[in-house]
């Protein structure tokens, strides 16, 4: 009997999206995915997005990134904090998270032809995916909410600009 590999691939991708999306949500709910600092939070919730993209391609990365972004919106709507308004905006909550998988996958694909060491390619791609999230969220916050963010934190525009642009 001939096995339908296309159906098997779709099933594997769907399972991976569910598993990695679930890990992202677990990291968010448990608090293990966030490191809270006075002015902003660092996250490791993007790591499942990178893993999905590198294992199964950009579609899986996009799907897991979308789950990460939607959960971020949900968290900031249901348990708002001082600067939650930033993540109520789908441009900030979703686009950088979706792009993590795209950038990670295509940078890996490009690098593997230039660099023979797969581990180095994975490392560079993971760094680029991480930077996609960081630069995307902080850059869009700067562009869209600089004054409102400064007011919420009760600090000057210059202090916010310096912080956002140097992180």
Where are these regions (language model features)?
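Loop-helix junctions at membrane interfaces
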Residues: 1-167
